[in-house]
Amino acid sequence: ISPMRLRHLSITAAVLVLAACDGAQDDTVPPESAPSEAAPVADIAVAGPERRILAFGDSLFAGYGLEEEEGYPEQLEDALRQGGINARVIDAGVSGDTSAAGRQRLAFTLDAQDTKPDLVLLELGGNDMLRGIQPDQTRANFAAMLDELQERDIPVLLMGMRAPPNYGTEYQQRFDALYSELAREYGARLVPFWLESIFE
């Protein structure tokens, strides 16, 4: 993903993250509810208590192949701060991570934080799909991570993914459904397909 595309996504996500932090009623946050273009935003003075957001995911958060300041968490923090939000987005992305790998390191990552995050962006599953891992296994790993976050009373914004048609109808339907099913089960906020604007 190019830095310009990430900038577009980060401005869109800033709206979604604010909704998640503020605990709005609707648990599903469609990307189309945000600005459709990465138009320049006038800086607003940063105010209020710091909101710590943990971006936990794979290479899409780690920024594989990008300069550090071009990564998604960094762009998101910049977009939030330009909007006057005193946000700190902590990059906890690891390139190549599957949901199983994320499950193994989540508790350690949370324990390593100075203070409890105000929100976790949970973005995994793409590498499961690329490796043909069965959606039931991916779902079980997500459920374990959501259990961990629920026990720690940390709100979650689930960053949904979708499988392409060439994976077959059955796989596609099972994979795509797991995010919305988990969001309903755990009361998590959901972006149904957070990369949607990239593929429009």
Each language-model region and where it sits:
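Cys/His-rich zinc-coordinating "finger/knuckle" motifs
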Residues: T28
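Serine-esterase "nucleophile elbow" of acetyl-processing enzymes
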Residues: P31-S95, R105-K116
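Second-shell loop/turn segments in exported
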Residues: L60-E67, D91-G96, N127-I133, P164-T169
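Alpha-helical cap/lid subdomain in secreted, periplasmic
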Residues: I85, Q104-E200
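Active-site-proximal substrate-binding core of FAD-dependent oxidoreductases
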Residues: A101
